[in-house]
Each structure stands twice: as C-alpha cells, then as structure tokens.
Amino acid sequence: MALGDLLSRSSPDQLTRFLAQVHGHPKKGLSQNFLIDGNILRKILAVSCVEAGDWVLEIGPGFGALTEVLVNQGAHVVALEKDPMFEETLKQLPIDLEITDACKYPLSQLQEKGWQGKGRVVANLPYHITTPLLTKLFLEVPNQWKTITVMMQDEVARRITAQPGGKEYGSLTIFLQFFADVRYAFKVSSGCFFPKPQVSSAVVHMTVKDTFPLEESLHKKFFSLTRAAFGQRRKLLANALKNLYPKDLVFSALNQLNFSEKTRPETLSLDEYLKLFQLLSLNS
C-alpha cells in the first residue's frame, strides 16, 4: 500500500470526527497540537533515516498520524502516550503501546521488554516538556539511540543548534552537542497543526555519537560546570564558577586556553569547555 493511502490520521476531518466520538478536545495542559499535514509527516520520515526493521520510540503519539507513517515504513514502534483518550484508537495500529507519563517512564525497561540494539526516537514532542524529555533520553540510556528526530518549539530548536557567541547558546546546547551531532532540519508553520499553536515549530535531527567525550563517571561533574557557567550568563565565567572552583584556578585555566580573565560563558565551544573542565579537574 502506498504511503499516501495511510495518511488518514493526518486528516483534520478524521481527527475532529474522532474527538466528537469520544467527546474529547485537545488538552492545552498536555501541549496537544496535532499534526495535520501529510507533507510534513513525509519530511519528518525522510529526515529521521528510519528504515524497515528499525525499532522506534515515539513520545506523545496522540491520534497517531506520525505513528501510522512509521508503521507503514516498516518500523517497530514503541509509543508512550499519557492521555488515555487515545488508547483504543492507537491499539488499532500494530505497535507496542504504553499509556504512561513519558517523563516518569524508566527507559531502561525498553531493553527489558526485548528492544535490543540501538533504536531511533521520532516524535512530535509536547512542547512544555521538551527539555526534560531530551535530557532524560541521554541521562538514562545514552547508548540506546542511533538518531533522535523531534519536533519542538522553533525557539528551542534554534537554542540547541546555536553556535558559541550568540545569546541563544547555552548549557542545553552544550549538553546535547556532547552526546550528538545536532542539526536544524526545517521549520514548520502553525497552520500545519490543529489547533494552531501560538509559536512556530521546527524539526531537529540528532545523530548520536558512537563514543562520548568523557567517561560516564565524569558526566555529572562536567554538566554541573556548564550549568553553573550559564546560570549567571551576564557574569564573567570565573565569577559564575566561583562556587565550584577558586577564581584564581579558573583564571589560570583560561590563560592556558588563551582566553582572558574577562571571558563570558557563551564564548567557549563544547571542546573548549571540555579542555577547561580537564584543567580544573587536574588542579582542584
């Protein structure tokens, strides 16, 4: 069957008919803005690199428009949906469905349930929990993923793909780029959703690295440094880190990296933060 034949769940008419049947409505508190544009679904599929036989984690499938496309591609889909309103309609698709809060779901259970090897994440993320969900994916099971392709608020997408020196660059940028090569794929207009969100959206594609820059036992300490650095981004970097390291030690490390004492947090790249961390760790 052709892909176009299976895009019925992206139909606004079918969505509104379903909502009428279950006497339901989009829940603002769950960031329920349903994708109703088949062309955008095709673009997400193309960007995601999903192939037949891949297993894919989808968070917040809702009515299942993206789910349906993934299934038609030949993927084995594990879907985590919080709203029980969608349970019966999602069960009509050949997927492994969990009605659960994705923020609380222990991702280690995926392997326990038999999902071996590296999977992919493809999702239209609930915007109010985008950052905690992305953080969770890498903190709980960083070696579980090949790629992560997610829709999010455009402002967040630009933040996590930002380059050093700009106001959008921050600790979340560094966190995600530590684990993956992160690419801004394309923007999505509000007219592609029902109901229309008040913000623009974008799709971001992450190719997860085979090896990470630091051993796992050092991750927490490194991210404590980057969070502290950007927690007070208007301050000089040495002042922002004063609760973690003596100021003269930070000055010395910056000097070794050819940065001045007046360096601000947004100046350093991921590689430079890694070098700074190693110098501070050696001398503290």
UniProtKB/Swiss-Prot annotation:
The keyword rRNA-binding does not apply. InterPro entries: KsgA/Erm (IPR001737), rRNA_Ade_diMease-like_C (IPR023165), rRNA_Ade_Mease_Trfase_CS (IPR020596), rRNA_Ade_methylase_Trfase_N (IPR020598), rRNA_adenine_dimethylase (IPR011530), SAM-dependent_MTases_sf (IPR029063). It comes from Chlamydia felis (strain Fe/C-56). It comes from the Bacteria. Keywords: Cytoplasm, Methyltransferase, RNA-binding, rRNA processing, S-adenosyl-L-methionine, Transferase. The keyword Zinc does not apply. Specifically dimethylates two adjacent adenosines (A1518 and A1519) in the loop of a conserved hairpin near the 3'-end of 16S rRNA in the 30S particle. May play a critical role in biogenesis of 30S subunits. This is Ribosomal RNA small subunit methyltransferase A. It holds the Pfam family RrnaAD.
